[in-house]
Amino acid sequence: HASALLALTNQPAGGQICADLYGDKAVVVPYAMSGLALAQRVAKAHESLPGCRGLILSNHGLVSFGETAQASYEAMIELVTMAEERVLWGWTKVFASIDLPVDPPTPSQVGPLLRGALARADNDLPGGHERVVLAYRGDNEIMHYVNGRDLARYSQVGVVTPDHAIRTKGWPLVLDGCTKEAITAGIATFVENYTAYFERHKRPDMVMLDPLPKVILAPGVG
């Protein structure tokens, strides 16, 4: 699921972009959901170019192969590097930032509030609650992202590949403030929206799993 490759396949002409870029090094497989349909398309695509070093699975990612594990690994590095270089051909878009407070809250201040709001009562567990472990990220790229003026728009357009939704859900929670009240309200709204989303799209045999957010964006924090 290389991000650079998905940045190419997810464009309106993504298939052609990848075909032009890779030539006979990799063959492009049209999108299909994971399962039999995708497997059939993969088999057909490989038959059309048996000497290729990889398969571009549109909106999924890249599969590379070779006679040895080392050869397969080297093919992966080569093909992803080509995608990374191709992405740089485009124009760089600068995202305008919001005006941040002079003294924004720190992760150590926000973390306990998040853990408390995400805890769920469960009398079968020690302490009577099911709790979560948070992992914080706040490098320069992430801070530019979460501090963007249009964060509420571009953060909600969906994951770059359906496979990510297994771990992250389809969209993150964007906090409108880092007070206890704002965090509690934000999580409650997320759960409500996710539950409604599940009810709209579920099949009769589906059971909803944990409706809590898996990724939380806090402007000024991370």
Could you say what each language-model-derived stretch is?
Residues 2-222:
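Glycine-rich flexible loops
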